[in-house]
Design a protein with these regions (language model features):
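Extended active-site and interfacial segments that coordinate phosphate-rich ligands
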Residues: 60, 77-92, 142-151, 220-233
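Short helix/loop capping segments that flank catalytic or ligand/cofactor-binding pockets
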Residues: 54, 73-77, 134-137, 144-148, ...
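Dual-mode signal for accessory low-complexity, basic/Gly-rich regions
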Residues: 18, 155-250
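Short, structured patches in soluble enzyme cores that scaffold and shape functional sites
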Residues: 37, 65-69, 127-129, 140, ...
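Acidic low-complexity segments
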Residues: 1-55, 87-130, 245-247
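Short beta-strand elements
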Residues: 52-84, 205-208
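Gly/Pro-rich turn-and-neighbor structural signature
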Residues: 9, 123-141, 149, 154-156
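Conduit-forming functional cores of very large proteins
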Residues: 66-68, 129, 145, 174, ...
Length: 250
């Protein structure tokens, strides 16, 4: 990460300005503006002489406005709930138009609470980015976690319908479905230069033309070295990542 951190006063002034701008109508009953900044330093030292230090600065701005009318309450957010979480500095907020968004989100909240309910029935649906992200997260992200595939998460967060023999031929979706995991993109939340085993980051195809090819994450534990090692060799997997050193690899 590069650049200097803005002083707290600048953050407070920005948040107060957006909060004030959201109060446009008596039907606006709740609003919030926030910026969470996380700093982390990871250092990996190996017995083979490796020494890698990586520094991260993660920005999580949030803006939400709730409107109430005729017994109904609806909430509108900027880019979805937790929809903005990237590495970087104040440029992340500028990229998503945070400054000046308070009034717009409030207007959208009013439009939402006054809009008629969606009609019932079977029809085509166009997914907005925040819903598309959730769909990918649940339908592809979690099922391709190796700890779930191996059954280690069954008592915590569940298992997966994916089994090791599916890789290389299982049709996950239509030929239009292409999904990659690319930790080399500098701005993304899950980006890194080297993973927690010292493997250099690289772009990996998860699903290509609808066919399942690879896990989105890599996983290694000494307690499971034999069975995980066999699967990793089968899939051509190297490396491992985890959310923090309070957790096992995921």
């Amino acid at each position: 990460v590069d650049g200097q951190e803005p002083p707290p006063r600048d953050w407070y002034e920005l948040l107060m300005a957006e909060s004030t701008a959201a109060a446009i109508d008596p039907r606006i009953v709740d609003w919030s503006a926030s910026v969470e900044v996380r700093h982390a330093t990871h250092r990996l030292v190996t017995s083979e002489g490796g020494d890698v230090e990586q520094r991260y600065r993660i920005m999580l701005p949030g803006l939400a406005v709730s409107a109430h009318a005729d017994g109904d309450t609806q909430t509108r957010t900027l880019n979805g709930y937790r929809g903005i979480c990237q590495q970087g500095g104040p440029e992340v907020l500028a990229r998503f138009g945070f400054a000046g968004a308070g009034r717009r989100v409030a207007e959208e909240a009013l439009e939402l609470v006054l809009a008629p309910n969606c009609p019932a029935g079977r029809m085509d649906v166009l997914l907005a980015p925040d819903q598309m992200v959730l769909q990918i997260h649940e339908s592809i992200g979690h099922p391709l976690e190796l700890d779930r595939i191996l059954g280690d998460e069954r008592n915590f967060a569940g298992t997966s319908f994916v089994t090791p023999d599916m890789f290389g031929h299982y049709r996950y979706g239509s030929e239009l479905l292409n999904v990659t995991f690319d930790p080399t993109r500098p701005e993304e939340l899950a980006s890194y230069g080297y993973d927690d085993e010292g493997t250099r980051a690289e772009r990996t195809w998860l699903i290509r033309r609808g066919i399942l090819e690879h896990l989105w994450e890599d996983f290694f534990r000494l307690t499971d070295a034999n069975r995980v090692g066999v699967l990793c060799n089968f899939l051509g997997i190297e490396g491992g990542v985890r959310p923090s050193h309070e957790h096992r690899y995921t």
